[in-house]
Amino acid sequence: MASAPASTPATTPWSAASWRQFAAAQQPQWPDAEALKQAEAQLATLPPLIFAGEARRLTSQLADVANGRAFLLQAGDCAESFAEFSADSIRDKLKIILQMAVALTYAAGVPVVKVGRIAGQFAKPRSNATERIGDAELDVFRGHMVNDDAFDVDARRPDPLRLVAAYHQAASTLNLLRAFTKGGFADLSQVHQWNQQFVASSAEGQRYELVASEIDRALRFMAACGIDLGAEDGLHQVDFWTSHDALILPYEEALTRQDSLSDDWIDCSAHLLWIGERTRQLDGAHVEFLSGVINPLAVKIGPNCTPDEAVALCERLNPGREPGRLTLITRFGRDRVEDLLPPLLAAVGGADHPVVWTCDPMHGNT
C-alpha cells in the first residue's frame, strides 16, 4: 500500500497523476520500479480502448435509469483470466447477457442498459497481502493483471508486463464485442431463439416459458404489422458497454487521455469504472483519480458505509449532480439490507443526488 503524503482533495489540483499524492489502497508491491515505469510509458502510447463520445452516451443512458425510464443490467466475471481467453468464451458471455436483457426489456417495458464486467476486469482486491499453504507464505493472487495464481514464488511476483498484456487482451475483447453487437449477432429474433432453446432444454428454463411465449407473440404481431425486424437497426444492433474495477491505478493513469474536442479527461480503459468497498476512502487515491475523469462511475457500498459517507462520496464524485454520472452498488447481505439500505436512500435522496441504485447479488449478498 502506498504511503500518504500530507495532501487533501481540497488543496490538490486534479491531474491524471494527482492520485499519487494520496494513500492508495490495494496496490501491489511492484519489485521493479523501473520496469513499472516502462510499462506505464508503453501503455501511454497505445490507442485508447474507448472514446469520450461513447462514455457520454452511456452517461445519457444511465440518466434514464436514474430517472426510472430504463433498467441497468451489469454482468460478467468476478475477474477475467488470461488462461481462459477465447472468442468462444467472449461470445458465450455476451450471449447470456443479451438473453437476460431481452427478458428484462419485455418484462419491465423499458430499455435495458447493458454493461459487461469485461475487457478489463483483470484485478481483484484482497483481504490479505499474503497467502499461506503449509509452511509456505507468498504474495496473494491479485488477478492476472498483476501476477499468476500458481502457488510459487515466481508466479506470485507482481510483473508490470502483465499490465501491457491486460491492455492487449482488453483490446481484442472489445474488437469482438463491437463486431458481435453491431454485426447481427445481437439481432432480437436470434436472441429470442436462444431463449426459446433455453426454455425447451432446461428444467430451470421452464420457469420462463410464459415470458418466452409472450415475447414470441409480440414478435409475430410486429411482423404481421409489416415491420421488417431485420431492417430495424434498433432490433438488429445493440449498445454494449464495458466496465471494471479501477483498482490498479498506474494502469488507469496510463490510459487516461484528454478529449480533443472538449479538453475533458477520460479514462480510456473502459466505459464505466467503479471503486470497490475496500478502496472508496474519501481521502484515498481511487476517489481522487476518478473524481477528475468524465466516465460514468460506480461505487460499491457495504455495511460500513454511513449515510453521511454516502452523501460525501456523491458530493466528491458528482458535485454537479449530473444524472447518470454516478451509480451506487449496494452489497449489504440479505440479512442486513432491510435495515441498512433505507437510511442511505433517504440521505442521498434528501441531498438531491440523482444516482442509479443497483444491487450486486454476488458480493456480500449471499
What is each residue range found by the language model?
Residues 310, 319, 325-357, 363-366:
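Non-transmembrane, aqueous-exposed alpha-helical and coiled segments at domain scale
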Residues 79, 85-333:
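Active-site-facing alpha/beta catalytic cores
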Residues 57-59, 283-286, 313, 341-344:
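Glycine-rich, charged/polar anion/phosphate-binding loops
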Residues 2-147:
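Long, contiguous, compositionally biased segments that the model treats as domain-scale units
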Residues 5, 9, 13, 31, ...:
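Proline-rich intrinsically disordered, low-complexity coils
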